[in-house]
């Protein structure tokens, strides 16, 4: 299913729903996250599932194939979106929260590379011992290179994480530099999943590096993530109750819907009325013509 989502959805989107560079949004990179999530799940199963080496090797190989399938595409989408930004077509309104989605593939890819590298160094290749690639001598270089690649991927995720936060906060100021607040919409939920996988990769880095800095930073990220989730839940519930979040600020019953349609029609009628100057139906007299 992850392969179908990564290839199929991306193909359909590019062939039948291509919006052009100006219409491209970070949501385009969501299908590739499916493949990276499956790869991360494969690493978790191999580490904690107590599988035999004969079962671990296929999972590890397929997981690396999924990473190779998805991560370069995520890099390509991020590059195209950066071109979109340079073209002064940055998202506006509540859609600007979607910038955080660009952090998702790198956070999930970083975690997948780290945990798969750790599994390889635990001896799965050495115990399998078949072929040239799946041998004891290659386990160390492959595992450590995978962990290092995970660190690099987390660095790229950090760029998009900081970029999204700056963009969201910058939208809260007007042109005079005064704070005017942030607009809430369902797009704010775009912060949760990418923030979560970015935090998960940071937690894994803290374990592999035995680093207090990464451990403290991952704790701060986790606390902030919980706060964002709670705020989104409260504001979403409030928006649903009042109806503003789904365009039902006049109420949920049928009469309120009719009143809304009536008010909208009256506004349109008022906008269509023009002052009659008596010049709308006049025709310029031709030379030599008489009335």
Where are these regions (language model features)?
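Hydrophobic alpha-helical transmembrane segments in multi-pass integral membrane proteins
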Residues: 37-46, 108-121, 195-209
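Intrinsic, low-complexity N-terminal interaction/targeting segments
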Residues: 21-43, 186-203
